[in-house]
Amino acid sequence: MSRQFPHSSAPLRSVKEVQFGLLSPEEVRAISVAKIEYPETMDQATKRPREGGLNDPRLGSIDRNFKCQTCGEDMAECPGHFGHIELAKPVFHIGFIAKIKKVCECVCMHCGKLLLDESNPAMAQAIRIRDPKKRFNAVWNLCKGKMICEADVLQDDGEGNEPKRTSRGGCGHTQPVVRKDGLKLWGTWKQNKNYDETEQPERRLLTPSEILNVFKHINSEDCVRLGFNEDYARPEWMLITVLPVPPPPVRPSIAFNDTARGEDDLTFKLADVIKANINVQRLELDGSPQHVISEFEALLQFHVATYMDNDIAGQPQALQKTGRPIKSIRARLKGKEGRLRGNLMGKRVDFSARTVISGDPNLDLDQVGVPISIARTLTYPEIVTPYNIHRLTEYVRNGPNEHPGAKYVIRDTGDRIDLRYNKRAGDIALQYGWKVERHLMDDDPVLFNRQPSLHKMSMMCHRVKVMPYSTFRLNLSVTSPYNADFDGDEMNLHVPQSPETRAELSEICAVPLQIVSPQSNKPVMGIVQDTLCGVRKMTLRDIFIEYDQVMNMLYWIPDWDGVIPPMNLKDLNNVKQMVVSGSKGSFINISQMSACVGQQIVEGKRIPFGFADRSLPHFTKDDYSPESKGFVENSYLRGLTPQEFFFHAMAGREGLIDTAVKTAETGYIQRRLVKALEDIMVHYDGTTRNSLGDIIQFVYGEDGVDGTQVESQSVDVIPGTDESFERRYRVDLLDPEKCIRDSLLESGKEVRGDVNLQRVLDEEYEQLCNDRRYLREVCFTNGDYTWPLPVNLRRIIQNAQQLFHGGRHKASDLRLEEIVEGVKELCKKLLVLRGDSPLVKESQENATLLFQCLVRSRLATRRVIEEFRLNRMSFEWAMGEIETQFQKSLVHPGEMVGVIAAQSIGEPATQMTLNTFHYAGVSSKNVTLGVPRLKEILNVAKNIKTPALTVYLEKDIAADIEKAKVVQSAIEHTTLKNVTASTEIFYDPDPRSTVLEEDYDTVEAYFAIPDEKVEESIEKQSPWLLRLELDRAKMLDKQLTMAQVAEKISQNFGEDLFVIWSDDTADKLIIRCRVVRDPKSLDEDVDAEEDQILKRIEAHMLESISLRGIQGITRVFMMQHKLSLPDETGEFKQGQEWVLETDGVNLADVMAVPGVDAKRTYSNNFIEILSVLGIEATRSALFKEILNVIAFDGSYVNYRHMALLVDVMTARGHLMAITRHGINRADTGALMRCSFEETVEILLEAGAAAELDDCHGISENVVLGQLAPLGTGAFDVMVDDKILQSSPSNMSVPVGAAEGAGAYADDGGATPYREYDMEDDKIQFEEGAGFSPIHTAPVSDGAGALTAYGGQPGSPSPTSPFAYGATSPAYGGASPGYGVTSPTYSPTSPSYSPTSPSYSPTSPSYSPTSPSYSPTSPSYSPTSPSYSPTSPSYSPTSPSYSPTSPSYSPTSPSYSPTSPSYSPTSPSYSPTSPSYSPTSPSYSPTSPSYSPTSPSYSPTSPLYSPTSPSYSPTSPSYSPTSPSYSPTSPSYSPTSPQYSPTSPAYSPTSPQYSPNSPQYSPRSPLYSPDQNDDKDKKQ
């Protein structure tokens, strides 16, 4: 902090936990410094704040001329002090009024005792609940029905004796029913049961004073049972007796002139409270009648309530004089602009800039062009050290207006010198330890951002490049992650203000490190637009370019071609070129421009008829012709007619509206996702947990791998026939046909017939068969065999073949059992979780299972020898490489995977169209998709728009459409209404005959055969007839017969209805029903009502008679689904099966239908799945649904993100919606919940329940402004005091010597890319070898000048084998790369000024010919000596460079480029020193005496000279993990003779020296010395 605060005796600590509670009246009085009694703020006589008024001077100063009377500080420093108002009568706190009512229902309103106690078993259960809020609700639910406070209870002793009476100390009074009305509570006392019902119950007001009195009597035990807290939140504190008055800084007033002040809303409101309070006091003293007093009490209650909350339902809002509602305290806190979300969770910050962006193809991917005006405004505080004092002095001299300058100097006392007003700025002598706020310079890391920030690639770290003019410039390829274009977009830039932040930005957030996105494990940046189009043109098969033309490509472009154009668009057509190369546009754009715009669609249909059956007035009625319904036949080129234009505008308008609505919807979805998952992090034990420590996943993503490190790979054991599988993997040494060819193996002859070896190979083959079976039956049942897995095996094998290509044509020296053993060992080494407990072992096995199958299938014995032809060296190298890469691809502890998952799901949602119109499928079966469906899933909606089942059938039925139809009709729910065409009621008095001609035959036929029962009932039959006519088509469709329908009707009504039905073959399908009357009630007047009865029967019949099928299934469609199953040869074949899809769901009943495959049947309503199949099935269903939504429009999101989301939603055993009803019902801290929604309610609830927030979450720490425990803050750093004491102090170096090093030493660059000054033309590259971006050789330095990360051992560094003299052509002063005009050696750079005293060209240590200081030396990166981008050991993916590795912490003393012992120019480090001659005897690499802990190694010790014989870089103990390892040490420099890549000692073919050989595992405990001996012997 640069500002100095006045001295305070309070110790400074970070907040560890927050205790919520209610203030008791005693506390309020104790906190208060003034009792406020007057509503005025100013004393009119003295024109000063009035004592005892609302702006009492003791509360804090409001005027910069006066000091605060309490603390004596001025306006800027005084934090303000609380006052208090003594209320004449207690009032309810508006936030707690509902809680007060509930407590009234729990305790006796007479004696304050809880109405139930442990003697009630349900109550005993409720009291045991630990969470106070839940406990209170449980107790309230039991007590609210209890209407009497019992004096003694009957207790049953359980042995059948008389129940005993035990006293519980109640008072025996009846309890009132409490009702809330506005701001009042009313109690209604019901009289005892034995009184008359007519008697009016007593109803009266429960005054706050009365309730306060009752609450004071609640004893501490009951207090805890009710979920309160004796110390922090007693129930009576929910009523306000003393109102705290916030200090003026909370409610500042504006001075218009000396007299008038504009007061804040809260001040107005407090004045109203005081006025009302004075009125009540006055009336009390005057002894006014009660009804008058209660009027004024209600007014006081109203003012206190609206002061806190002015949006009370059913209450008039308190208004200001202008008629604007007053802004209450609650309104200040809640909502997006409120205190929490607006000022605590997110604030406006300093050191930021915003301007328009434009593109610049000449910038690096990770650079950003910053206007000079911004660079002069933004600063970075740099601490003065011996290494930068010259440079900083130069900046201070330049002052604030000249670009490489400075704005402020801050002394160690904290005083700030403003250089704008300091006339003698040039004379300020900087001291070590001061700070200089210097301008933004080239290569400073900055955070660059474009809103909306939908994923983490919307904020990335760029390197500054200061440029003229006023816009930010950025490389074209970086626009896609920002979703930016140059049509006027603006972007924000933030400057980090501490070395830690800079380090974190440049090592974690740098653009090159974000190229591969974890969202869908693919690059998010690529070549776009012009570049893409140009690249395609240059690389067409028929375009040939001369070498010199390529060299000068920037100056002219070849126009050679010799191709006859085809009939379609010429390849030279500019539009077509853009489409084909993919830089802009699509096929449809071309068609619409040149051929025809096509049909316009609104809401998924053609243009609708707007009025009077036409779409526009000049069409005729019912015109369905194309032009009337919106078909545009013209192209944009020909132009649209007016009506076409109008229809086109309609469709376009819909798109715009859709986009606007969608943006708001998806923005809210994204916010909810982030809030639900924000605290989920990978911990150091490999588990994924939230801030409470609940385990969400045992292993992140179920495999523990980082989403950016996986690639789609095919597991080769899954596809293919059994025969081809055997051919590919089985080795039979006893059968010459199936044995490996002799010519491929050195031991080819010996292995023939080796039974023991055959046993090993059989075991391997058996394992492969098991893999194949398991993967086919469990994992990939549909025969799909690609899956995102870590470590690209194909690439590793290819690199192995190329690096060790000598062995490709010779027989391999591998032994077969070595391969099997090697693969087994490798599988054991793939550790995701470490530990021995059974649980850990199981998780470990599950996590690596798929990858093990992949490794076993790729590195099977037969394939290694026959297909890949690896020899021992290349095989061992590959094994080591796989292990290293696998360890590298594991997820880092501290990674905030929750937020990544939320962004990965929210971002595609933004791209989704809102209403995805129903896809044209079978008879309009529609499914909700897109954003509306995503909303349903995340809200866990009870009633979804389109519930549907997918009913799979048993094998034999699924193949046969006829059998499937039987099941279909059995499932589809059919009511009588579905098949009825019409119903009629007739008066047809004779039951044996009929007045209807067409029914005559039916009736005759029925009565032709006499039946006793029928004869009996004829007498009782009603003359009214209900006649149903059924629809024959529907009956046939549903396969129903008349008899079945009639039987269902009879079943329903039994003997009371007489039913006659026509034959199935009759002309019309008729059912005749008559009511059978009870002979007892054969009165005449019944006849009159009978037709009414019949009408009711008719309605009931149609609605409720279910003919067949399952309730809830309205329709069933038959669909053919593709199915791939292995046939008898073992190959997956595509087949078809019939599947039923339904509208409506009823999973439990459908599963029970015979013929349905219950195992596969699926419902898209996962709430139903939860009730039928349980939570684990729900998790899969939920995953499937989210996947469907995302995959529908062709997006792909990696499995792990969706898995994490569904795991969070189901982790507690019930479905947690991603809404306030789900997220905010979790037991996370109150601060975290209130930062989402319902801010004030949650804080009030937290106060009443006296919650404790332990600040483990993200939001809590953001609110408190602390470092949250995530990412680099997830661990603590242990400081080694011993090393600290022995470390060199900054001041111990002569300034001159240090200055050379300090040239640019203070800060590393941000990215591993850079331009190279020189290249050796003698280098030959093999095709493709080692140029993969991930391939590393950790020791060879300077390798791979053409790739980002490192290359192969045949290192193209500009070196010659032994000649290291100063005359070496690569370093001579005459070397073209080293002119004084060379750009890296700019004479204007301040520290290079030839007049600088430390730069004596004659100084032996600073000879420009010193090889280590040539600007072309890879270790001399212009930004810092320690930052050689070409060094593979600096590769961001290099194992030894793990940002978590303690020895490589950029702040560790041994790494600090500012540490004196690392200055490459320090005299003792001169590589030209004679003892560095490689032939010098003292330079023995095997010298045993070199131990980094030996006293002679203390960097400050006088004995420590690199010339000391014991200092050998190749000495075994000089391991890269040793604390002394620094890439800048000259012994690691590519110019060191020991590292000459061409030196025979560095033979890439020497197996022991392979940098990635298994012995060189970066985690291997020692870099074993005997390797070096072997090497010497070999030479």
From Swiss-Prot:
<feature type="binding site">
    <location>
        <position position="485"/>
    </location>
    <ligand>
        <name>Mg(2+) 1</name>
    </ligand>
</feature>
<dbReference type="InterPro" id="IPR007083">
    <property type="entry name" value="RNA_pol_Rpb1_4"/>
</dbReference>
<dbReference type="InterPro" id="IPR006592">
    <property type="entry name" value="RNA_pol_N"/>
</dbReference>
<dbReference type="Pfam" id="PF04983">
    <property type="entry name" value="RNA_pol_Rpb1_3"/>
</dbReference>
<feature type="binding site">
    <location>
        <position position="487"/>
    </location>
    <ligand>
        <name>Mg(2+) 1</name>
    </ligand>
</feature>
<feature type="binding site">
    <location>
        <position position="108"/>
    </location>
    <ligand>
        <name>Zn(2+) 2</name>
    </ligand>
</feature>
<feature type="repeat" description="7">
    <location>
        <begin position="1427"/>
        <end position="1433"/>
    </location>
</feature>
<feature type="binding site">
    <location>
        <position position="487"/>
    </location>
    <ligand>
        <name>Mg(2+) 2</name>
    </ligand>
</feature>
<feature type="binding site">
    <location>
        <position position="149"/>
    </location>
    <ligand>
        <name>Zn(2+) 2</name>
    </ligand>
</feature>
<feature type="repeat" description="14">
    <location>
        <begin position="1476"/>
        <end position="1482"/>
    </location>
</feature>
<dbReference type="InterPro" id="IPR007081">
    <property type="entry name" value="RNA_pol_Rpb1_5"/>
</dbReference>
<feature type="binding site">
    <location>
        <position position="111"/>
    </location>
    <ligand>
        <name>Zn(2+) 2</name>
    </ligand>
</feature>
<feature type="repeat" description="15">
    <location>
        <begin position="1483"/>
        <end position="1489"/>
    </location>
</feature>
<feature type="repeat" description="25; approximate">
    <location>
        <begin position="1553"/>
        <end position="1559"/>
    </location>
</feature>
<feature type="binding site">
    <location>
        <position position="68"/>
    </location>
    <ligand>
        <name>Zn(2+) 1</name>
    </ligand>
</feature>
<dbReference type="InterPro" id="IPR000684">
    <property type="entry name" value="RNA_pol_II_repeat_euk"/>
</dbReference>
<feature type="cross-link" description="Glycyl lysine isopeptide (Lys-Gly) (interchain with G-Cter in ubiquitin)">
    <location>
        <position position="1080"/>
    </location>
</feature>
<keyword id="KW-0808">Transferase</keyword>
<dbReference type="Pfam" id="PF05000">
    <property type="entry name" value="RNA_pol_Rpb1_4"/>
</dbReference>
<dbReference type="InterPro" id="IPR007073">
    <property type="entry name" value="RNA_pol_Rpb1_7"/>
</dbReference>
<dbReference type="GO" id="GO:0046872">
    <property type="term" value="F:metal ion binding"/>
</dbReference>
<dbReference type="Pfam" id="PF04992">
    <property type="entry name" value="RNA_pol_Rpb1_6"/>
</dbReference>
<keyword id="KW-0238">DNA-binding</keyword>
<feature type="repeat" description="23">
    <location>
        <begin position="1539"/>
        <end position="1545"/>
    </location>
</feature>
<keyword id="KW-0539">Nucleus</keyword>
<feature type="repeat" description="24">
    <location>
        <begin position="1546"/>
        <end position="1552"/>
    </location>
</feature>
<dbReference type="GO" id="GO:0003899">
    <property type="term" value="F:DNA-directed RNA polymerase activity"/>
</dbReference>
<feature type="repeat" description="20">
    <location>
        <begin position="1518"/>
        <end position="1524"/>
    </location>
</feature>
<feature type="repeat" description="22">
    <location>
        <begin position="1532"/>
        <end position="1538"/>
    </location>
</feature>
<keyword id="KW-1017">Isopeptide bond</keyword>
<feature type="repeat" description="11">
    <location>
        <begin position="1455"/>
        <end position="1461"/>
    </location>
</feature>
<feature type="repeat" description="9">
    <location>
        <begin position="1441"/>
        <end position="1447"/>
    </location>
</feature>
<feature type="binding site">
    <location>
        <position position="485"/>
    </location>
    <ligand>
        <name>Mg(2+) 2</name>
    </ligand>
</feature>
<feature type="repeat" description="1">
    <location>
        <begin position="1385"/>
        <end position="1391"/>
    </location>
</feature>
<feature type="repeat" description="2">
    <location>
        <begin position="1392"/>
        <end position="1398"/>
    </location>
</feature>
<keyword id="KW-0677">Repeat</keyword>
<feature type="binding site">
    <location>
        <position position="489"/>
    </location>
    <ligand>
        <name>Mg(2+) 1</name>
    </ligand>
</feature>
<feature type="repeat" description="3">
    <location>
        <begin position="1399"/>
        <end position="1405"/>
    </location>
</feature>
<feature type="repeat" description="17; approximate">
    <location>
        <begin position="1497"/>
        <end position="1503"/>
    </location>
</feature>
<dbReference type="InterPro" id="IPR000722">
    <property type="entry name" value="RNA_pol_asu"/>
</dbReference>
<feature type="repeat" description="8">
    <location>
        <begin position="1434"/>
        <end position="1440"/>
    </location>
</feature>
<dbReference type="InterPro" id="IPR007080">
    <property type="entry name" value="RNA_pol_Rpb1_1"/>
</dbReference>
